[in-house]
From Swiss-Prot:
One of its GO terms (cellular component) is membrane. This is Cytochrome P450 52A3-B. Its cofactor is heme. The chain crosses the membrane at residues 17-34.
Length: 523
């Protein structure tokens, strides 16, 4: 066949739109691949192993992740997956162009969060979270984040001591709810989530939604707060969808059902009610509110009167102040109920410091005196080690950069991270690495925190993140959890776990909690 005839037959296909589109896409992907290879060579980088089940386009890998999340098994799926990669890192690509590096290496986590902080940002998190959380400290980067942090930092610097006294009325209601079960099995986690929404709304808004009040107690819940009865459930549902949007990466926009939009509206309705109430208050009313006890919203109103800013920051703090503390309390009591020796040892320390039962000296419990309870601190450290509030997180590269190690056959080479790529770090697995925590890394053992091996963990223990974006409210959460556990230890001598599954399935939204609830009996 003559060359002219071949050209004559092929040429019409070369001018078709789909051929041009395919050629352009192929050229684009090839140019990206060649560019990345060039910089890998120039920077003496090597890729870690490729994620075996991701496939070339990465979609199968994302589907597996979402399935595991929906089944309550994402944390353990990640744990088991990293066991297949001895150098603690691997990577995948999505749609042939987005590189995702997954790591549990403390040195890589340190680079992302601290030493190379300016090389990474939240990436698409704002788009993922915007429908519920808007422009707040957890969704913003750059100057917006710096402004938010500067605005919020003072709110957590001056509140700790008075905070424990404000908890006691809510603890009393919590205890009444527990005692209603008369030693029978009940879901303690469900009560903790109601408890923390009550304490968080009082701290943030100046009024509690009193979700622990119900007909069983003979105390009717308040009905003067619009949207109060729907708030907690709507907040939970919205976070479920936000998590799915996050794990969907660039396909987040596909998760936007009517239920999600309706729940966001319900959450915003309650927040707007409190914001408008604060903005409508006179200066004398604001001053009077402050005298009656610290109120986050009324302090924030002194800095800005923008209702959108107030709403967004309040909801951002609500995620941290409510969900992380509820998860920490739930997992701590889950393990304490399974380990009576640990529970009894903890009660002995609390008896020495504050008394038990009818001899409990509640007035002596404060921010300062709680810090003296070393075993209580070890119990919380161990809970956060095994069940970190945010077990999986990610950052996006703002420029071409590298991670210090994990590449190549021996895992010692740096990894090239192109601009726009994501680094997913899984502290849930980091906290279980044998080289840092020993052969019993999967065992709940608070005593490890008195051993020399845990004094130099560095970035192998990051329950509250690290670097410039370290959690502002970590001491606030630890103080609240310490107070609640202390008071429960004073009131209940015997705990018994009724959960049959171990390790437990874990629900990961924006934070982590027990997937099925924490079922115990308490006497």
């Amino acid at each position: 066949m003559a060359i002219e005839q071949i050209i004559e037959e092929v040429l019409p296909y070369l001018t078709k739109w789909y051929t041009i589109l395919f050629g352009a896409a192929f050229t684009y992907f090839l140019s990206i691949a060649l560019r990345n290879k060039y910089y890998e060579y120039k920077l003496k980088c090597e890729n870690p192993p490729y994620f075996k089940t991701a496939g070339f386009v990465g979609i199968p890998g994302l589907i597996d992740v979402i399935k595991a999340k929906n089944a309550g098994k994402l944390a353990d799926y990640a744990d088991q997956t990293f066991d297949e990669y001895p150098h603690h890192s691997f990577y995948m690509t999505v749609a042939g162009m987005l590189k995702i590096v997954l790591t549990v290496d403390p040195e890589n986590i340190k680079a992302v969060l601290a030493t190379q902080f300016n090389d990474f940002a939240l990436g698409a998190r704002h788009a993922h979270f915007d429908p519920l959380l808007g422009d707040g400290i957890f969704t913003l980067d750059g100057e917006g984040w710096k402004h938010s942090r500067a605005m919020l930092r003072p709110q957590f610097a001056r509140e700790q001591i008075a905070h424990v006294k404000a908890l006691e009325p809510h603890v009393q209601v919590l205890a009444k709810q527990i005692k209603l079960n008369k030693g029978e099995t009940f879901d303690l986690q469900e009560l903790f989530f109601r408890f923390t929404v009550d304490t968080a709304t009082e701290f943030l808004f100046g009024e509690s939604v009193h979700s622990l009040y119900d007909e069983k107690l003979g105390v009717p819940p308040p009905n003067n707060i619009p949207g109060r009865e729907n708030f907690a459930k709507a907040f939970n549902t919205s976070q479920h969808y936000l998590a799915t949007r996050t794990y969907s990466q660039m396909f987040y926009f596909l998760t936007n059902p009517k239920e999600f939009r309706d729940c966001n509206a319900k959450v915003h309705k309650l927040a707007q009610y409190f914001v408008n109430k604060a903005l409508d208050a006179s200066e004398d009313e604001v001053a009077e509110k402050s005298k009656g006890g610290y109120v986050f919203l009324y302090e924030l109103v002194k800095q800005t009167r923008d209702p959108k800013v107030l709403q967004d920051q309040l909801l951002n703090i609500m995620v941290a102040g409510r969900d992380t503390t509820a998860g920490l309390l739930s997992f701590a009591m889950f393990e304490l109920a399974r380990n009576p020796k640990i529970w009894n040892k903890l009660r002995e320390e609390i008896e020495v410091n504050f008394g038990l039962g009818e001899e409990a000296r509640v007035d002596e419990i404060s921010f300062e005196t709680l810090k003296k309870c070393e075993y209580l601190k070890a119990v919380l450290n161990e809970t956060l080690r095994m069940y970190p509030s945010v077990p999986v997180n990610f950052r996006t590269a703002t420029r071409d950069t590298t991670l210090p190690r994990g590449g190549g056959k021996d895992g010692t080479s740096p990894i090239f991270v192109p601009k726009g790529s994501s680094v997913v770090y899984t502290v849930y697995k980091t906290h279980r690495l044998e080289e840092y925590y020993g052969k019993d890394a999967y065992e709940f053992r608070p005593e490890r925190w008195f051993e020399p091996s845990t004094r130099k963990l560095g970035w192998a223990y990051v329950p509250f993140n690290g670097g410039p974006r370290i959690c502002l409210g970590q001491q606030f959460a630890l103080t609240e959890a310490s107070y609640v556990i202390t008071r429960l230890a004073q009131m209940f001598e015997h705990l018994e776990s009724k959960d049959e599954t171990y390790p437990p399935n874990k629900c990961i939204h924006l934070t982590m909690n027990h997937n099925e609830g924490v079922f115990i009996s308490a006497k």
